[in-house]
Amino acid sequence: MTKNILVTFDMQIGDYEHSDKYIFHNKTTDYNYCKQFWSLKKKNKLEEGVYWDNQGLNAISVYSTQEITEQETKTLKRLGVA
């Protein structure tokens, strides 16, 4: 049975801070969530739990993870939130 894991990311893109959400169907490590979300090619750690992008210009980290129901997943997708 697949799970619905709502992951909230914090990103530093240039001078801007940004947050985004994505729904994954398997529980994994914070690095693997970042790797899948940003297509990271290698583990380039800026500090504990924070990773550089492939160019070494922007940073990403997992802010939170939460298991959600199938109904919550459908609602978030319908609203375009995740």
Give each language-model segment a name.
Residues 39-82:
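Short, mixed-charge low-complexity intrinsically disordered segments
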Residues 1, 7, 27-28, 64, ...:
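Intrinsically disordered/low-complexity terminal segments and short unstructured peptides
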Residues 2-30:
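N-terminal acidic leader/helix
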